[in-house]
Amino acid sequence: MKFHRLTAAVLAGSMLALPAAAETRVTYKSAKSASSYYQMGVQIAEAMQEASDGEISVTVEESQGSVQNVMEVRARGGDYVFTTPPVLVSLAQGGKAMFEGKGDPAFDDIRALFPIPSLTMHFVMSEESGATTLADLEGKTILLGKGSFGATEGEKYLDLFGLADKVEIADVELSNAVPAMQNGQIDGFVTAGSWPAPNVVEAAASTGVTVLSMSDEQIAETGRTKLVIPAGTYAGQDEDIVTTSLPVAAYTTTKMDDETAYQLTKTYWESKAKLGESSAWWNGVDEGLMENITGQIHPGAVRYYEEAGIALTDAQK
């Protein structure tokens, strides 16, 4: 398992209330180390370091994906921050889908902090495969990865589009997607990293790929939101890529104290503009994404949103 340790500073609360600042350690559970979401975690930690004076230490921790992140709530304490689509929190709390038979009271204690860039589905095919549409996946060997939301979503799409029995699924980790494509072990891979996704950037630059677009009808079948990745985002992509997206947020649980939740949320929003200067995926994050958080927000984060004048729904408070 990989860890990226960064000291992230978060401004202390009132000096009258806290006469001596004590270090608070926070674990930020993200995704696979080659993914955009792992890089986001590192960037968030760096931003907090720059904005503060070392009172919170953030350890960015690699993960197999969003499902694992939610499941670990059962064994984690008040220092646990993790990322996942809001829909997975709802499924966990309802004991549905991949959480059926795995319900736990700890899931009811999950609380949101702030939204981060949305998941973006990428169907990435090697140029040698000749695939230019989803229908062309028939007879191809595809890597979906294991345990991640992208893998689950990819399986869903293959089933929806009548391809489940027409493709071969490679038993390869997503972190090995690019070398597997280079040596001809796979024809393509599916990843749900926010654009520009690092593994897609690498594949496009090193082997030549086609990132497949979806039709409006296919997007409607998925029930997800339409998203357009601009032409030129990836090497060799001369046209816009039309695909789907799903909101993602950073979460903790009621075990986290209000002050820590407040400072994490405050520093995140105050650092977001600078984050966007170095990575394009942050530019799509604004207050409008708050409406995608369908569950409760941590009281400490609620305090920040109320101070900042950001409207919350009754269900979020």
Spans of model-derived segments:
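Bilobed "Venus flytrap"/periplasmic-binding protein-like clamshell domains
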Residues: 25-51, 56, 115-183, 287, ...
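Pocket-lining segment of extracytoplasmic ligand-binding domains
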Residues: 85-86, 94-97, 102-103, 165-255
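Bacterial N-terminal signal peptides that target proteins for export
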Residues: 1-8
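N-terminal (or domain-start) structured segment
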Residues: 23-91
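Acidic, polar ligand-binding/catalytic clefts
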Residues: 80-117
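Sec/Tat signal peptide C-region and signal peptidase I cleavage site
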Residues: 16-22
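A bilobed periplasmic-binding-protein/Venus flytrap-type ligand-binding module shared by bacterial periplasmic
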Residues: 116-131, 226-229, 246-260
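An extracytoplasmic/periplasmic, membrane-proximal ligand-sensing/linker region
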Residues: 172, 176, 182-183, 193-202, ...
